[in-house]
Amino acid sequence: MNQPRTRGPIARLFIGLWDAVNFSRRLVFNLLFLLVVFVLLAAMLGGGKLAPLAERSTLVIAPEGRLVEQYSCDPVSRAFARATNGNDCREIRLRDVLRALDAARTDKRIERVVLHLDELQPSGFASLRDVATAIGRVKAAGKQVIAYGDNYSQGQYVLAAQANHVYLDPMSQGGVMLEGLAGYRQYFRQGLQDKLGIDMHLFKVGEYKSAAEPYILDAASAESKEADLFWMNDLWQRMLADIGRARGLDPAALAANIEAMDAQVAGANGDLAQLALKQKPVDGQKTREQVEDLLLEKGVADDTAEGGFRQVALDTYVQHLDGALPQADVRPQAAVAVAAGEIA
């Protein structure tokens, strides 16, 4: 009968080391898992009871993500994205922003509104226009609105233009990037027919039906260009009119400056911030610290708050508004279904 093989001391040493490494690996991964669970729970619970909203507070609106009618992610995914600073599920519900702005207009506890739009991602013009109109109502009610940022994209500036004062950070070398509207589409006829030998047969009714053009043409048809220019020009003129009205600028002069942007930038030696200051889309150049000093001077000091001035974030203010709502109406309600994306 064979005797069990006895391991030598060196083998037992390496086996022991491997067991220790394996145990450490499992311990570290389990601790990381527990940490993630703890962070998710903390993010979802939101820290418990809200502190009362103090008088003379500044409402800080710093959206991170794009404006949407309805969240596309579940609460757990949104909480995880916030906790890990991820790009997925970064969305701001449009009605929350509108509710906050409309409430701040008459809320005596809110002294002013600050817009920090650096993290606002491209959003639909209809949503941007709704928010811009709400900002205008706050300003019309006599409350100061201040916008500041490192750089303003076209969508971000649609909102910033409504502020009483618009500032650019001189350290960021950013500017106001108004560039108009454009549409891009890929065309596949050459690849399908000439290279793959696929013959496409398209039957359509109406000259302006262009959805299937990429399969039979190498470029947009005249009718497709005409249709796109029709809605793009209309949208662009509305955007210029809104910006011009808010900033006291002539929309035609604004459009002319954008058309000659290359020459304008060259004339400013590539300094986009100075160009924006010269053309009046912004009121001045201030660093983040200078803006915070300005808000501290006009507001109330708070050593526990970021920037040192008394403030309330958008999410927190919406929670205050939710807490003040009456009990749910038990009568039958009309549900609104939000549809987004392509119909396939």
Model regions: which residues?
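Small-residue-centered hinge/linker elements
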Residues: 2-265, 292, 296-344
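Short acidic-hydrophobic, aromatic-tinged amphipathic segments that line or gate anion-handling sites
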Residues: 166-168, 282-288
